[in-house]
């Protein structure tokens, strides 16, 4: 989780933050009777506290996709996040956007198989090629669950709000190049990777 403050442009103060979610997904293997197995999963972990940056975005949890044989596909996941901003008393408008940065999971073996994760915000696809508007007070977009930010962007204190993206597996390959149309043809195993979403906040004076 990182926060980066960009320089001023005219009278606009623009800040971006990148929310990084580590993702694991896998296909299950049926076990025969009287066979036992044990596995140990280890997570690398860090802890961070940041209550001073102009914009802080924190993912609230991780993502885990499971293959379901009955639908020949993977389940979708709701990924919650927390947004905190510092108010600017000189601001007359506020805008918050998001953009997909990375979304590829790679299988943890020699197959090279990949899965791509799609990100959706309130019915709008979060893409790499353009910004998804989450708040735009100048045009009456007040952010739904993020509305406390639309109301507090020009306050003298910090304001927080929580919302979520919907994550789903939208495409895959068997070897990194050959696309699959039927997920049941994917190799067995576990895919791992990061889904990164960049948030940009602009205070206009």
From Swiss-Prot:
Residues 1-32 form the signal peptide. It is found in: Fimbrium. Disulfide bonds: none annotated. It holds the Pfam family MatB. Keywords: Fimbrium, Signal. Induction: Negatively regulated by H-NS. Positively regulated by IHF and EcpR. One of its GO terms (cellular component) is pilus. The keyword Signal applies. Self-associates. Forms filaments. Interacts with EcpD. Part of the ecpRABCDE operon, which encodes the E.coli common pilus (ECP). ECP is found in both commensal and pathogenic strains and plays a dual role in early-stage biofilm development and host cell recognition. Major subunit of the fimbria. Belongs to the EcpA/MatB fimbrillin family. This is Common pilus major fimbrillin subunit EcpA. It comes from Escherichia coli (strain UTI89 / UPEC).
């Amino acid at each position: 989780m990182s926060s980066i403050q960009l320089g001023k442009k005219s009278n606009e103060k623009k800040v971006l933050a990148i929310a990084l979610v580590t993702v694991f997904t896998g296909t299950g293997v049926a076990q025969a009777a009287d066979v036992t197995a044990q596995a140990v999963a280890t997570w690398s972990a860090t802890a961070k506290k940041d209550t001073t940056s102009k914009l802080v975005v924190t993912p609230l949890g991780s993502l885990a996709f499971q293959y379901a044989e009955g639908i020949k596909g993977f389940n979708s996941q709701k990924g919650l996040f927390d947004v905190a901003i510092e108010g600017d008393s000189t601001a007359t408008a506020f805008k918050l956007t998001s953009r997909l940065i990375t979304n590829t999971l790679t299988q943890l073996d020699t197959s090279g198989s990949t899965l791509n994760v799609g990100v959706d915000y309130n019915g709008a696809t979060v893409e790499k090629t353009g910004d998804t508007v989450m708040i735009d007070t100048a045009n009456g977009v007040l952010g739904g669950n993020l509305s406390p930010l639309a109301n507090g962007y020009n306050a003298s204190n910090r304001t927080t709000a929580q919302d979520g993206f919907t994550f789903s597996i939208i495409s895959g390959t068997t070897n990194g190049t050959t696309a699959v149309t039927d997920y049941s043809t994917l190799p067995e195993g576990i895919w791992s990777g990061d889904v990164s979403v960049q948030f940009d906040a602009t205070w206009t004076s």
